[in-house]
Amino acid sequence: MLNQKQTDCRFGGVAFAAGEDLSLKTGYLARLNAGGDLVLPQGAAEITPYVLTQGADQGYLCGAVPLTSAGNCRVKLAGTCEAGDLLVAKGDGRVEAGVSGGEALPVGTAEEKGVDGQAVLFRPAMIGSVTVAG
């Protein structure tokens, strides 16, 4: 019989220890490392399912929001974008305007015009596919 209890599942904001100094990285994309700590990505192809909402020094709790198409969020922009542009991972936790099919991982769609350094409003979206070797 299927156990339908979901009492250990969380929706909304989460807190994890910072795996590196994230004190000035609010609004950046992040991922969990093997130790279960939040860290910035090391490249544009890494999957980053969180946006930092409260940075912290290494080892301290920081806040994050999981990316979901059910709601928009703000993330740091590198360069400029127009509303409707596809935003892709830059590889350092920021996003930039890009195209589908490039090497960078698509993250979502800009919902407003943005300038460099702005926390741009965007709608996360599952775009593209990932090939699993094996």
Q: For each of these PLM feature ranges, what is it?
A:
Residues M1-G134:
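Glycine-anchored, exposed beta-strand/edge motif detector
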